[in-house]
Amino acid sequence: MFRFLDWQDFFTAPREHKESFRYDQDTQIGWAPPGVPETAKGNDKRDLKEYFNYFSHGTCPTSLQPITTLAYQQLHQVASTLLAWIQNHTPEEIQTKFSLPLPEMILDSSQILFRINYYPAITGQEEIGALRAADHTDINLITVLTAGSDAGKLQVKMLPLY
């Protein structure tokens, strides 16, 4: 079972330790230090976070490889199950417009991202108006969120159903 605490030592390690896993703009793999994370649409401040992007063909710290690979595989299976449920409950006239059945869209895909987010403690030195994660809309086929390591701190805004 994946626990963020397994990754916490990586994120709280000195910057020099993390640099060898530095985020690569072309591959989207690796550690994105503070100041690199994106700015949410409609916001002019970067999110106050670090993250590590992991893909099945990517790399991560050796000590974290087994649990990260396992978590990636488990989340992939959850996503596949969710997509099958969505497919099964989608009206036929909409299903006919899909290029593939939804679960097949993620089979053998090299584009499935597992992002491990880290939100450092607030120091009081942050730019006014900066947030850990500003309101945003994910642009993925599906986003699977795990429970946060701090109970009750993950906020998800529900939008009206279509």
Label each PLM-derived region with a short phrase.
Residues M1-Y162:
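Peripheral, non-catalytic segments flanking oxidoreductase cores
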